[in-house]
Swiss-Prot record:
GO biological process: ATP synthesis coupled electron transport; photosynthesis, light reaction
Gene: ndhE
Function: NDH shuttles electrons from NAD(P)H:plastoquinone, via FMN and iron-sulfur (Fe-S) centers, to quinones in the photosynthetic chain and possibly in a chloroplast respiratory chain. The immediate electron acceptor for the enzyme in this species is believed to be plastoquinone. Couples the redox reaction to proton translocation, and thus conserves the redox energy in a proton gradient.
GO molecular function, one term: oxidoreductase activity, acting on NAD(P)H, quinone or similar compound as acceptor
Cell location: Plastid, Chloroplast thylakoid membrane
Highest taxon of source: Eukaryota
UniProt source species: Jasminum nudiflorum (Winter jasmine)
Keywords: Chloroplast, Membrane, NAD, NADP, Plastid, Plastoquinone, Quinone, Thylakoid, Translocase, Transmembrane, Transmembrane helix, Transport
Entry GO CC: chloroplast thylakoid membrane; NADH dehydrogenase complex
Protein name listed in UniProt: NAD(P)H-quinone oxidoreductase subunit 4L, chloroplastic
Reactions that this protein is recorded to catalyse: a plastoquinone + NADH + (n+1) H(+)(in) = a plastoquinol + NAD(+) + n H(+)(out); a plastoquinone + NADPH + (n+1) H(+)(in) = a plastoquinol + NADP(+) + n H(+)(out)
Length: 101
């Protein structure tokens, strides 16, 4: 596959993630869009690592760390959303102002 095709795919996924993050009102959907953004960045890391084939540019190793951070972010984010849902009975972003209590 050509480099341009992969970069266009990654830019498309990144754009979908940004659009979903801006327009979503549900916390779980916002977390999913954030994961989509992380995955599009990982696609870029792996693509450039394979394209340049340089010993100092190791995007595939860095993408493993990004996957680990994204997994931790998803676990913590879902725990926070679960706690907010137990207390507020809603996962809507505009209804979860925790400072007004």
């Amino acid at each position: 596959m050509m480099l341009e095709h992969i970069l266009v795919l990654s830019a498309y996924l990144f754009s979908i993630g940004i659009y979903g993050l801006i327009t979503s009102r549900n916390m779980v959907r916002a977390l999913m869009c954030l994961e989509l953004i992380f995955n599009s960045v990982n696609i870029n890391f792996v693509t450039f690592s394979g394209f340049f084939d340089n010993r100092q540019l190791r995007g595939d190793i860095f993408s493993v760390f990004v996957f680990a951070i994204a997994a931790a972010e998803a676990a913590i984010g879902l725990a926070i959303v679960s706690s907010i849902y137990r207390n507020r009975k809603s996962t809507r972003i505009n209804q979860s102002n925790l400072l007004n209590k």
